Amino acid sequence: MLGLVAGTCVGYLVQADRDPTPLTSLSQVTLTQAKGEAPEPLSAAQDRRVRTDGDLRKLLLKKPKGAKEADWLEGADGWMDLADYAADYDEPGNMFGSFLGSEFRRAAVTGWLAGDSSVEIRLVQYRQEETVAASEAAENGHYWAEREDGTESYPVPGTGDGMAYVHTKPFVELGGVSAYSARAFAWRGDIAMEIWVYDSKRISKQLIVDLAKRQMEQL
C-alpha cells in the first residue's frame, strides 16, 4: 500500500514539473448570415391575430339594409368596458369581480331593429394569460340556455362546439308584453361570441344559426 502511495506521489511530482501541453485550438463554426430583406409581415387575411388585435368592432356583422340602429346597447361607440358588460347581469358587483378574474380585456357590440325583431351581437375578448376564458364563457352560455324549458338547440356549422338556441315559450317583458327569444354562443381563440334575438313571434332556427355562422366566419 505504501509503495502505491509513493508511486502516485512521484508520478504527480514529475507531472507537476513539466510544462503544460498546449491544447489544440477548437474549430469555430461560422454561421452564414441570410441575405436579402426580411419577409413581409402577414396580412390580416393571413394571420387571425392581426385581425383580432385590431379594431374588434370591424369584425362584427354589419347592420342589414333597411334595419334601424339599436338604441339600447350598453357602452359607447360600439365598445363595452368591464363595468358596462357586468351591468347587464342581475348582480353587477359580483359579476364585475368574476369577469375581472376571468381576465376580461374588452368587448365590442352591435345591434339593430328589423320590424319586431331585435338583434344584439357581442364579441368578448379575454387576455387568457392564466385561463382559457373564451371557451369557458361559451360553456357558461350553453349551460344557462339549456336550463330553460321549451328550448331547442342546434349546432353552429364550422365552430366545433358552438350552439344556437331557440326558446319556444314566450317570456313576459317588464311592460307586460310577451316576447320570444333565441341566442347563440361560440368561441374562437381568445374571443367569445354572444348573439341575442328577440321577437313578438317565435324565432326561426334558420335566422339564429345563420347569424351565428356568419359572425363566426368573421373571426
Predicted regions and their residues:
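N-terminal "mature-domain start" segment
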Residues: 7-107
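Residue-level signal for secondary-structure boundary sites
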Residues: 18, 129-131, 203
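Hydrophobic, Leu/Ile/Phe/Ala-enriched alpha-helical segments that form helix-helix packing faces
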Residues: 111-112, 138-146, 215-219
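A short acidic-to-branched-hydrophobic micro-motif
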Residues: 106-135
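N-terminal export and membrane-targeting signals
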Residues: 1-2
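Extracytoplasmic/luminal low-complexity segments enriched in Pro/Gly and acidic/polar residues
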Residues: 173-219
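A mature extracytoplasmic/lumenal domain signature
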Residues: 123-127, 138, 197-199, 212
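Short Gly/Thr-rich strand-loop-strand
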Residues: 130, 134-182
